[in-house]
Amino acid sequence: MQFTNHMHQRMSQRGCTKSMVAFTLSEGSIRGDKYILNRKTTQKYLSYIDNKIKNLRWRLQEKNQTSYQEILNELHELQKSRRIALKILDKGGITVVLDGEDLITTYNINSFKRC
């Protein structure tokens, strides 16, 4: 994927990081040329991550030294994903627009709601 200059500007203006864009591309739903990760989907993903973290912490207490480091690594990765998902949830969701392999723009889902 190629980030355009426009994409970099919009990410800077709207407080989106590359990790948030990558997370949206991997977990979001596709609608036309957009990847959308809304609040509801993000909340479902967070509950899934929380359950996995809970299970891994339970497995750590078993004191099985052969898989201890693997579990710690997986736990660390899940915590990073959880942190990113929480940022996206705070924004109300994110939309990323693509044109082929070029990332065109990104915006918060609730950015078009006007009072």
What are these regions (language model features)?
Residues 1-115:
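Ribonuclease/tRNase effector modules and their secretory precursors
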